[in-house]
Design a protein with these regions (language model features):
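C-terminal beta-strand-rich structural cap/linker in extracellular carbohydrate-active enzymes
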Residues: 185-213
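Soluble or luminal CAZymes and related metallo-dependent hydrolases
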Residues: 51-55, 103-111, 229
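Surface-exposed, proline-anchored Ser/Thr-rich loop/turn motifs
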Residues: 215-236
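Ser/Thr- and Asn-enriched, surface-exposed coil loops between beta-strands
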Residues: 134-137, 185-189, 231-233
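Intrinsic-disorder/low-complexity, polar/charged segments enriched in Ser/Thr/Lys/Arg/Asp/Glu/Gln
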Residues: 148-150, 198, 232-234
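Short secondary-structure boundary/capping segments
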Residues: 10-11, 143, 190-191, 216, ...
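Conserved alpha/beta catalytic core and glycan-binding cleft of carbohydrate-active enzymes
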Residues: 1-85, 120, 124-165, 175-178
Length: 236
């Protein structure tokens, strides 16, 4: 798929007012499409739950690093894969809290949360200074602010293939989601990625992404605010 129409610049807009999304209420869910129509090559089968989740994470790596506001739809962060016609197009849809018990779906949740936290924490993902190539099997986004550069790159094939990060410069780049680093000696040289492989590189060491889910959050201290304060002694 070609993602560039999700970039506000592609429409000639000067402000980041384009709300982009990968799922909505009036179309089949992307997880459903992958599960039903996904491609297969040898042992790489996108219709399997684990691989479907990998493809969703790959897509989210680009959705959430395109600067501008985003929308997510009900249980998208857990890979909701029921058809829009189940039971009918305008019927109420099943609320599937049980999805969170799935290790694979929980992984999608954690990566989605980490990507959102990353874009909210680091200014490079809010910049106006970025270029992109989003219309092929090798996709990339290059973002820059004065003190940080970021390059997002992924292989959308179901086979190994070359990707073209077009790093902003040579030198050491840090992989935010693995904690590893690479030394780039040729900024325009291709890299060979496995099917569905993706990376978010920065030229400043931001540390390694923290993948935290609801299990971890619920054991952390909570703050509760009461209103009105003072009260009449009864809290409902």
């Amino acid at each position: 798929s070609d993602f560039k129409w999700g970039v506000y610049k592609e429409r000639g807009w000067s402000n980041k007012h384009l709300i982009t999304y990968s799922e909505s209420h009036d179309e089949e869910r992307s997880a459903y499409k992958i599960k039903t129509y996904g491609n297969i090559s040898g042992g790489y089968n996108t219709t399997n739950l684990a691989t479907m989740v990998d493809r969703k994470i790959l897509t989210n790596a680009f959705l959430f690093t395109i600067p501008g506001p985003k929308m997510t739809y009900m249980f998208e962060e857990l890979g909701y894969d029921k058809s829009i016609n189940d039971p009918c197009r305008i019927c109420e849809k099943s609320i599937l809290w049980s999805y969170y018990a799935s290790t694979h779906r929980k992984r999608l949740y954690k990566y989605t949360a980490a990507l959102i936290n990353m874009r909210n924490t680091y200014g490079v993902f809010k910049t106006d200074n970025f270029i992109y190539a989003l219309n092929g099997d090798s996709k990339r986004i290059n973002l820059s602010v004065p003190d940080t550069n970021a390059t997002v790159v992924g292989n959308f094939r179901v086979t190994p293939g070359d990707v073209y990060p077009n790093f902003q410069h040579t030198g050491t780049w840090y992989d935010y989601f693995t904690g590893d680093s690479i030394v780039v000696t040729n900024a325009t040289a291709p890299l060979t990625y496995q099917p569905g492989e993706w990376h978010v590189y920065t030229d400043v060491n931001l540390g390694k992404a923290s993948l935290i889910g609801m299990d971890e959050i619920k054991h952390q201290p909570s703050r509760i605010a009461l209103f009105p304060n003072p009260s009449n002694g009864i809290v409902e």
